[in-house]
């Protein structure tokens, strides 16, 4: 069964928001629906079939015994990349792409062997080593694990790459192209789509969107594992560790076209802004809100909040106590979020604007 998703899911995750219109790559022109508040809007009518094609490629690759390497080293992608790869028994790089990870696999394999040897030494109690030597060995292990932990069991170069942010992961893509490895990638409006085998035009910065892409790719890989085992005649139910089966969503949303009358272009931004979780943004979605309307907030504090990825009332309104505590500590605000009631004020502003 193919992995299902709807255009509404993409809209709610903010997948249609590109970058500011002056930061675009002209090669992405065919995938742009229009411009709203100087922000390019991606044509999700093209994203949906493109994402379906990428999911099918992942499923087919895994079904025939191939390996999929998830690549996403930016902060907002790292956790989703690792979680999705582990859940689907695939491989990942989420820290830093080391030059030659694909094209110089022999050297990388040597580093992986070193990681395994260090692991064995530490697990065996590091007998005969001084405290300083054990500490140095632990630090070496941590460094190697961070760089190579996601590929230490890969056993060879992958058969397909799934990439978040083609600008940041240019080196990985170039190495894959050199070896003829197909690449499925999320390509934003400021990216170059050249050389990408499966172009998925979509936002590559929003945390919710990245989590959605990774979840779908993981589900496609899991489906591929099931298909592969079925083709081999294996009794999956008799296995001691049967393959995880993804349950269908409780309510299947009907896919709609951005160009149709079902969702007006003016409502696109409002749909994406109905978030239940606090999300920091690399840039404002449309025009930023006037945060000086919050109690005691002046231009300097607005700049601080913007630098921390906060541009809109709806972001602050979605903050939970733990989000408030973290941001307050990061910006050294000494409890002003709670003391001045910024979250409550922001919720009031959001409700007033929706009325």
Curated annotation (Swiss-Prot):
Keywords, ordered alphabetically: Ribonucleoprotein, Ribosomal protein
Domain of life of the source: Bacteria
A Pfam match: Ribosomal_S2
Alphabetized InterPro entries for the sequence: Ribosomal_uS2 (IPR001865), Ribosomal_uS2_bac/mit/plastid (IPR005706), Ribosomal_uS2_CS (IPR018130), Ribosomal_uS2_flav_dom_sf (IPR023591)
GO molecular function, one term: structural constituent of ribosome
Gene Ontology BP annotations: translation
Cited PROSITE patterns: RIBOSOMAL_S2_1, RIBOSOMAL_S2_2
Keyword Secreted tagged: no
Annotated Gene Ontology cellular component terms: cytosolic small ribosomal subunit
PANTHER family (UniProt xref): 30S RIBOSOMAL PROTEIN S2 PROKARYOTIC AND ORGANELLAR, SMALL RIBOSOMAL SUBUNIT PROTEIN US2M
Cited NCBIfam families: PRK12311.1, rpsB_bact
Protein family membership: Belongs to the universal ribosomal protein uS2 family.
Protein name according to UniProt: Small ribosomal subunit protein uS2
Organism in which the protein naturally occurs: Methylorubrum extorquens (strain PA1) (Methylobacterium extorquens)
Gene (name only): rpsB
